[in-house]
Amino acid sequence: MNFDLTNRRVLVGGATDGIGWSSAKLFAAHGANLILLARNDKKLEDRASELSAITSNKIQTLNVDFTKPEELEHKLSQFLLSQSLEVDIVINNTGGPPGGRLDAASSNELISAFNMHLISYHKILGVVSKGMKERSFGRIINVISTSVKQPLNGLGVSNTIRGAVANWSKTLSNELGEYNITVNNVLPGATNTSRLNEIIRNKAQKQAVDKQLVKDGMASEVPMKRIAEPEEVAYAILFLASEYASYINGINLPVDGGRTKSL
C-alpha cells in the first residue's frame, strides 16, 4: 500500500510528544506538509528541525494552548489566513485530564477538560471545515481512548469527556459525509507515552509499590501481554487519513492489543 500524502496539509495536535509526535514523523515520511500544534515553543522548534532534517516537506509550527479554546481559534484562523493555507487532515490530540474518581471531581475540573478537548476540537472544526467542504475532501481523526467503550477506573473526568468527543464525532460524521469529509476516532489502549508514565507513577505512589510492578500489571491485562508503542497508534491514524479509508466514516477504532472486552 502506498500512503502518498503529497500536497496534503495536516494539522497535528500535541505534536511534540507521544502519539502526536509519532504521527507527525509518519505523515512527514509519506509526503505530507505539517502544521505542528503544541504550547512549548522550544519543543516545537526542536521537533520542526528534526523533521526538516529528514524531509523537504513544509513543516510549520503554531504555539497554542488547548485550555484556551477562544485563543486557539483566533491564533489558528489568523495563521492560516495570513498565509492563504488550507488544512486537509486534522489530528485532534491533546493530553488527558488528571486522574481521580468522578464523584470527587470539581465542576471546574470538568469544565477545564471540556475546554481542552471538546470545545477546542470544535473551534478547530470551525476554522477548517469551510475549506474542506469547498474542496470536497477532509479527514478529521480524534485520538481519544478505549474508555469510550469501557470506562477506566480512576479516570473519571477523562472517561466523561472522551465519551462526549466520541458522540460529537459521530454526529459530525453524519453531517459532513456528503462533502467527502470523514470523521473517525482512534482509541489507544495503554501506550508508552508520558501520559501513561504519569498514570503509572501516581498509581505506584498510592499503592506504595515499584513503578515497574504497576507497568507489568497493566501489560498483563492485555491479551498481547505488552504495552503499545506510539508508532503503532500512528499507523492507524495514517490509514484513516489515507485514500484507502475513503469509505470509513464514524467509527471508533481501538488500538489496544485486544484489552477492551466489549465488541
Model regions: which residues?
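Catalytic Tyr-X3-Lys loop
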Residues: G96, D103-K123, F137, I141, ...
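Conserved NAD(P)H cofactor-binding loop of Rossmann-fold oxidoreductase domains
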Residues: N93-P98, G258
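A conserved structural motif in NAD(P)-dependent oxidoreductases
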Residues: D210-K211, V222-V233
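Conserved glycine-rich cofactor-binding loop
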Residues: R9, T16-G18
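Conserved glycine-rich Rossmann-like NAD(P)H-binding loop of the short-chain dehydrogenase/reductase
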Residues: A32-R47
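Short C-terminal tail/terminal secondary-structure segment
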Residues: D4, I19, Q150, I237-L238, ...
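Catalytic loop of short-chain dehydrogenase/reductase
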Residues: I141-V165, S169-E178, A190-T191
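Short, small/polar-rich loop/turn modules that mediate ligand/substrate recognition or access, typified
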Residues: G177, T182, I248-G250
